[in-house]
Amino acid sequence: MDCGSVGGQRTQRLPGRQRLLFLPVGLSGRPGGSETSARRCLSALSDGLGALRPRAPAARGGVSRASPLLLLLLVPSPRLAAAAPRRQLGDWERSRLGYAAPPAGRSSAWRCSPGVAAAAGALPQYHGPAPALVSCRRELSLSAGSLQLERKRRDFTSSGSRKLYFDTHALVCLLEDNGFATQQAEIIVSALVKILEANMDIVYKDMVTKMQQEITFQQVMSQIANVKKDMIILEKSEFSALRAENEKIKLELHQLKQQVMDEVIKVRTDTKLDFNLEKSRVKELYSLNEKKLLELRTEIVALHAQQDRALTQTDRKIETEVAGLKTMLESHKLDNIKYLAGSIFTCLTVALGFYRLWI
């Protein structure tokens, strides 16, 4: 949760993101500094996590910066942030140490022990009328939802002991050397440990350990061995009967195949004989038809010869008759000419006789 201005107005939260803010604290754990230092701290907090400057001890005389890698590790993933409700850092630390929660909604700042103030990273307190600073302090309380993830039962641990993935004491010493208080360093390391444990829980939901893999592999191999034994037993008992039945069926199939082949050969021979008989019969019919055609041709030729003979005879008869008629006409013609000439001469003689008479 960030503070955008000294007036204490709440800025919008980024979805799925949680920021861990470290406030400057003195060596003795008592409120100290001036109002200008408080305002400088507030402006640095409003700029983001990169501008955090924890105050170093007075003997050092310098200001150290938090490591960017450490700040990146302290920002949990959106999936972890959505899994648990948000809770302020002061409430979480007070519930861990056994302190009661302060009353909410008051304008004045509440006081606690120096150790708790140093662990929570409290701002310097003022007893005067500073409602803007008090409201900003109330707005700058840390939401540590990812630190309150309930520890689930893990299958990958043989005992309920806590498993660490890095040297926490060395990290605490490093943070103390860089200007953080002891309780602040312990809180940061505990937050890192819990974040790593939560991430490992998420990883182990989808994965298994080497031991579990070996156990599962041995179980699968034992099941495969049992299946092999069952297969051998079945091969000796049931597979022998199945093989005998298969052999019997093969013999029956072979016999049926032989019978079918014999029937096919018989049918082929019968069809061949039928084809040959039909072929010979067709050939005989063809020869008979050829003979009949030859006889018909000879008869037709004889009829044509007879017809030609009859025609020649009729032609000759017609010619003889025509010649006889011609001779008869010629003879009648001569007779007619003779008769006409005789009649004409007779008429002339009569006419000459009458003419002589008249004359």
From Swiss-Prot:
Which terms does the UniProt entry file under GO BP? Answer: calcium import into the mitochondrion; calcium ion import; mitochondrial calcium ion transmembrane transport; positive regulation of mitochondrial calcium ion concentration
Topological domains, Mitochondrial matrix: 86-338
Residues in the Mitochondrial intermembrane compartment per record? 1-68, 359
From the record, what ranges are coiled-coil?
Answer: 235-310
Q: How does it sit in the membrane?
A: Multi-pass membrane protein
Membrane-crossing ranges are: 69-85, 339-358
The entry's cellular-component GO terms read: mitochondrial inner membrane; mitochondrion
Give start-end of the signal peptide.
Answer: none
The record, for Pfam families, names: CCDC90-like
Which keywords are on file for this protein? Calcium, Calcium transport, Coiled coil, Ion transport, Membrane, Mitochondrion, Mitochondrion inner membrane, Transmembrane, Transmembrane helix, Transport
Q: How does it assemble?
A: Interacts (via coiled coil regions) with MCU; the interaction is direct. Interacts with SMDT1/EMRE; the interaction is direct. Interacts with PPIF.
Q: What does this protein do?
A: Key regulator of mitochondrial calcium uniporter (MCU) required for calcium entry into mitochondrion. Plays a direct role in uniporter-mediated calcium uptake via a direct interaction with MCU. Probably involved in the assembly of the membrane components of the uniporter complex (uniplex).
Protein's recorded name = Mitochondrial calcium uniporter regulator 1
The gene it comes from is MCUR1
